[in-house]
């Protein structure tokens, strides 16, 4: 007689990934992040679900290009937290000058991301790449950019932040 229904293997299937999910949740809250700058970003930006200030320019621009509301709120809060005044979305590498933050949406092909990252590094501008693991080609391009990046990078699965300032080379995957 064959036993049907949910056996013990099927009941415990979800527990296999539990340690990695708990680890990611801890990093999301800031545990294990030993950089004061990144820790403050985790606490003041990633863990907020509402806008911190009345400024909404970046939020409105991101909502127009169909970025998720949560990601738009986080990036607007990041702009306020880092005291950035100007931003550009999907600009050419030559247009990065005089800009604090550049956002590369999913409309930018993976082949052009490295050029954009190099120009952002030259101009000391923070680069935000939306959906870094959208497909295999974009994921590989973003991994290569992070490996070559001389400063701090933060990947929170929704976007990849490449800071080009005084911070040491650190890679965070939250």
PLM regions and their residue ranges:
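A short alpha-helical cap/connector motif
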Residues: 1-123, 133-174
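Short beta-strand/loop segment that forms part of the nucleotide-sugar
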Residues: 127-130
């Amino acid at each position: 007689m064959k036993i049907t229904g949910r056996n013990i293997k099927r009941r415990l299937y979800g527990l296999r990934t539990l340690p990695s999910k708990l680890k990611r949740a801890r990093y999301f809250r800031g545990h294990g992040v030993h950089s004061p700058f990144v820790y403050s970003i985790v606490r003041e930006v990633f863990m907020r679900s509402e806008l911190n200030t009345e400024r909404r320019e970046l939020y409105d621009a991101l909502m127009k290009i169909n970025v998720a509301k949560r990601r738009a709120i986080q990036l607007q809060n990041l702009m306020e937290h880092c005291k950035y005044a100007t931003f550009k979305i999907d600009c050419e590498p030559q247009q990065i000058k005089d800009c604090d933050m550049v956002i590369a949406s999913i409309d930018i092909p993976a082949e052009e991301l490295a050029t954009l990252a190099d120009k952002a590094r030259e101009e000391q501008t923070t680069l935000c790449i939306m959906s870094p693991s959208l497909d295999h080609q974009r994921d590989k391009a973003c991994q290569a950019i992070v490996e070559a990046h001389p400063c701090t990078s933060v990947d929170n699965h929704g976007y990849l932040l490449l800071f080009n300032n005084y911070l040491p080379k650190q890679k965070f995957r939250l």
